[in-house]
Amino acid sequence: KGYDTSPLEQYVALAVVAGALSSMGAVAVLNESAHTSLPAGVFKSQELGKHSLEILREGFPLTSLFCGFVKYEVEDIEGVWMRTYGADCFGLPDFAAHAQGHHEGQKYSDIFNNVLRYLLESGAEMAAGHTMQVGKTTFMKLRDPLDDEYYLQGPGTTLVVELIEEDECNAH
């Protein structure tokens, strides 16, 4: 894990090494705890440019490699579950949402990435019962997974995101 205490700095260092190894034939970077992988060539300095470290620290979506974003269907449940894995490495909760279909993947990936980035940079904490504005009139309300949502269990805390409109915030 290296000597830096920041998980983000550790991941940035690993990404830089992966980029260097890609010129020697490395094919992919795997983040097992985040349930994700990316082609090693994504991290080549030529691909990222002269500000590669800043890009990896500040501009690279956390849900691309550092905290994975996974979509899956659960038997006998309509729709698609979308969730993050690996946020516990940063001391953050993972997020999950029950979407209508795979077409909502980018929306939820963006929401999760933005919220995780905010939590990481601000030091703020979120828990079940909290709400947060994620769009002009859209808020996310957080809850713990229900007992029958066993498939959302993970090594750390997972919070279920329910998107609500502004007028629903005070109705609950």
What are these model-predicted stretches?
Residues 1-4:
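Long, hydrophobic/aromatic-enriched structural stretches that serve as scaffold segments
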Residues 6-17, 104-111:
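Short amphipathic alpha-helical segments
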Residues 11-30:
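Acidic, low-complexity cytosolic segments
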